[in-house]
Amino acid sequence: MLSRAKGRCELCGITNEQKMLEVDHIFPKSLGGKDDLSNYQALCYSCNAAKRNTDDTDFRLFKTLYEHREDNCLFCDIQANDRKRIIAENNLAYAIRDGFPVTDGHTLFMPKRHVNDYFGLVQSEVNAINILVQEQRTLLMASDSSIEGFNIGMNCGEVSGQTVFHCHVHLIPRRRGDVANPRGGVRHIIADKGFYEDKK
């Protein structure tokens, strides 16, 4: 069972080096589950404790989900063929510097799985991306004292401006004076909507 799981929790994807894995029934014996190889799964101790013996969810399906990649996708390709661009990663996500940065230090965060946008992420991927965002924010702040703020966001769908249809989150460092008037921030994605206070 542990060999089949390739050293990862079949729910959250964490490695057995980070958390001990446990083999347990998919369908609990208390619900009629059998002692059979097809009814076992490997979960980290946290996921197994949360599952308890009342849940019959087959978490092995998540392994296939997490491994999904697509041909001719820029961010799927980077993982396989351009790993030198990767500046940080964890089990389910990775980070690169933007190839066309808005400001110095502009960083992108992607799930390793191919998924079109933020709304297709599962919670463990959201968590994995957030961990990397926090880590990179800390590193950027420590390495560049001119950074005083950040814009963070994503484009979801063609009408929002998305051009690469593999979910990616932008972290854009901001410095005093990088624009004449920063008030309104992300509201400026729609012309004339940024300075809403002028319309009161």
Regions found by a protein language model. Give the residues of each.
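Short, intrinsically disordered, charge-biased short linear motifs at domain edges
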Residues: P28-K34, T57-F62
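Short beta-strand-alpha-helix junction that forms the catalytic/metal-binding core
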Residues: C9, L31-A50, H166-L171
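Short metal-coordination and nucleic-acid-contact micro-motifs, chiefly zinc-binding Cys/His arrays
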Residues: L2-K6, D36-Y40, L65-R69
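HIT superfamily nucleotide-processing domains
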Residues: Y66-K200
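A generic "alpha-helical surface" signal
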Residues: S3, S38, A42, S124-I131
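Histidine-centered catalytic micro-motifs used for acid/base chemistry in nuclease
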Residues: E22-P28
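Short cysteine-rich loop/turn motifs with clustered Cys
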Residues: M1-L21, C44-S46
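Short Cys/His-centered divalent metal-binding micro-motifs
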Residues: E17, Y40-T64
